[in-house]
Amino acid sequence: MFDLMAVTKALADENRVRLLAALEGGELCVCQLIELIGLAPSTVSKHLSTLRSARLIQGRKNGRWMYYRLADDQAPRTARTAVAWLLGVLDGRKRILDDKKRLEKILETMPHEACHGKHPSGSYRKNTNSR
């Protein structure tokens, strides 16, 4: 029952749904997701935490950066079924199509720059550490 309640709670927010749809294309850095959704980093992190708690997504840390992807076959059946259903329902929706176009531009113009503090808009502080 916990899985069902956690999944329905996670899907009850438009921004979390948008995050799931963005991850359909593969793994993304949290910085890229922040740029796509256009919310404060703390808000996006909270949404990602909710999705992760529901086991709809998985994350991995690489240095200072977190990367997220849709949950794999090891996720509970409830989570896998919910994600498959959701992505089917969202297919062709204007907001999701707009997000996909925006994400393409984000990935073209700053595949890793946002993660390293070099976003052209200046919305992120420059990283002074050499990498």
Describe each model-derived feature in a short phrase.
Residues 1-2, 97:
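Amphipathic alpha-helical repeat elements characteristic of tetratricopeptide repeat
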Residues 2-43, 49, 65-75:
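N-terminal helix-turn-helix DNA-binding core of bacterial DNA-binding proteins
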Residues 25, 74-131:
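C-terminal regulatory/oligomerization modules of transcriptional regulators
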Residues 48, 54, 64-66, 79-85:
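Short, structured secondary-structure boundary patches
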Residues 53-62, 69-71:
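Beta-hairpin "wing" of winged helix-turn-helix
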